[in-house]
Amino acid sequence: MNKYSDISESARDVLMEIGNIGTGNAVTALSSMINHRIEIERPNVKIMKFEEVPAMLGGPEEIKLGVLLELSGDLNGMFMFLISTKFAQTMLDKLLGTEVEDVRNLDDMSLSAVCEIGNIMCCSYINAMTAMMDLRVHVSVSDICIDMTGAILSVPMIHFARLSDELLLIEDKYHFDDQEVVSHILFLPEIHSLERIFKALGEEYEG
């Protein structure tokens, strides 16, 4: 077994619980950051094939903002936080009082704010995962990319598709005021890290 889709229901439940804990921690931090109450639905944790991801995110030509963090230590790989233009516009309005017409022309302060939001979200899941699996990791400085979904995904997909044709995707839906916004987190582990995850979940790994 060397695919997410091969794991047992009990291991899937652990992944779901990691998603729940990460989401709870993230929404608490975001609410404090923007000083505004945020409601969040139960996260949707999915195991998906690479080729299915662009359609899941609205199509390859949909403009997204991506925040990338690399992991090293007990786990090596990449976390990617993807948000829509609507999500970015809403959060920047709440956080900075900035009305953004085109997310491709954000100033440095707005870019920094989006990076910080991505850091909060990804690190909430990373902390939940490493605590539950008793692992130690180092998280890189985040990087941000604003482009079409297909372009943002192309580099990590080329690299990680050699290792596995599946990834872990976490979808979160947020509600504040009368708005609903959605974000996605992708986790792409290196092959030896996938082996460690399987072992931590009590699953047998076959390379």
Residue ranges and their predicted role:
Residues 2-27, 31-207:
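Composition-driven recognition of glycine/serine/threonine/acidic- and proline-rich low-complexity segments
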